[in-house]
């Protein structure tokens, strides 16, 4: 490669590529979450019969992974580029390799391996067949074919491609520390993010009010339940995300025991499952608006029998 792509040029290249494959370009969802999978643009849209093709950048917060900005590769917050396609194209892996070529990575010149790594997210009742993608010995992407989301079987199957943008950029720019990544011409990643990394790490590990977080979890859980009683799927799911992030803060602080941890995860999972069922029922009531007319009529007729 002649000029190395900046972080934002990597994003722009991936956006253009997946736009050309028919994906809608969504924006990052405005609630804290631990992974792009937890965005409603993936979690909710992966279930039910309607087609869905979307791509978006998702900042992902993992309080327990914070290292005060001192670790070159471990972060409180990193960025994922998320692609979800339902139904899954038969050539999704070929499309992925083509996207790497657009980034200047020729698959014929590098050791690219798909390493089996089936995926599970216990807190949302989700699982699928998966592979890690390793580029010259470094994991850069997670591939998943969802089999279950929110405790519901997926049909049709959704394919998810999650690029780790920091790792990808480190490789492309040949730097050893994420903080040396060039975000834009003349601006390094560390100049933007190293201070927030330090502050969030200090807060997560030392400063956060455990009693407040415990109370907030209970309040968020209760409010999610109230929203669901009114059939309000999206506000309810916002509170599921708040429960998840609050739990992650408690976990980072060491405020929950091993047995309590399992209990909190089960509480989040139970809410997520009700949200998923309610969402599917809502889409059916609306007549599956994203389906083509013929498929919609056939499916609604089958449901009415």
UniProtKB/Swiss-Prot annotation:
Superkingdom to which the source organism belongs: Bacteria
Pfam families from the UniProt entry: tRNA-synt_2e
EC code: 6.1.1.14
Enzyme class: ligase
PROSITE patterns in the cross-refs: AA_TRNA_LIGASE_II_GLYAB
Principal place of residence: cytoplasm
Molecular function terms from GO: ATP binding; catalytic activity, acting on a protein; glycine-tRNA ligase activity; transferase activity
SUPFAM superfamilies reported in the protein's UniProt record: Class II aaRS and biotin synthetases
Cellular component annotations (GO), alphabetically ordered: cytosol
Localisation per UniProt entry: Cytoplasm
The keyword Metal-binding appears for this protein: no
Family statement: Belongs to the class-II aminoacyl-tRNA synthetase family.
Annotated protein name in UniProt: Glycine--tRNA ligase alpha subunit
Naturally occurring in which organism (per UniProt): Streptococcus pneumoniae serotype 19F (strain G54)
Gene coding for it: glyQ
